[in-house]
Amino acid sequence: MTDKDLIDKNRTETTQTINMEDRKIRVAITHGDTNGIGYELIFKAFSEPEMLELCTPIIYGSPKIAAYHRKAMDLQANFSIINNATDAQDGRVNMLTCIDGEVKVELGTPTKESGDAALKALDKAMTDFRSQHFDVLVTCPAYAQTMNAENYSYKGLKSYAETSIGEGAKGVKMMINESVRIALATDGLAIKDIAANITIDNILDKVRKLHNSMKRDFRISNPRIAVLALNPNVNGTEEKEVLIPAINETNIY
């Protein structure tokens, strides 16, 4: 690579960084179960003017269903209908149509129809995610038992996202507030199965993913990560045989 190539490469990377910092974060929001509280949460959240100053929302849902909820709740909520995520405009609540045809709304009662609508919105959002049309995905509440499609059994958002992204992608379930981020080493397991899943490879994977997320997503240049012991008073063997060796092997401190 010549000096000119290096200069051009650096200039391009700098321009991309500036563009990312200049534009607002694009937040995709799926409407969840159409008989639930998804649209109420969306409309009330974006009734605050400062929300549109923070981000550009793209609602994956249905204008007809949104209008039904708006009328039922007697809310003053405006949205702009778009055909593609790339058409989203800053300063507006952008509504991307994911549902063809009519969907019966029965407020407060999850149905197969409302579950299908939730899954269709998720499917469309994940397709756009793979095309990098938005920066972050927020999902409104849905009822997992009604979100099963033909040849597919919905087992929660984390599992769904991993399957949708493919390529062996594995996520980390996290709980976050303003001061702390907690990542789970295991989730969805019976108590009797937890210890067997506390392995060096698993701990290494979770710690490294958490470390990368702290730097990339939260702009923490030198994250400090605490790994919690498994046993009360460290009275087992997992700490000595698994946790401490995994920490020593991370090479991130």
Which positions does each model-derived feature cover?
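Anion-binding alpha/beta catalytic cores of soluble intermediary-metabolism enzymes, centered on
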Residues: 3, 17-253
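Asp/Glu-rich intrinsically disordered low-complexity tracts
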Residues: 3-15
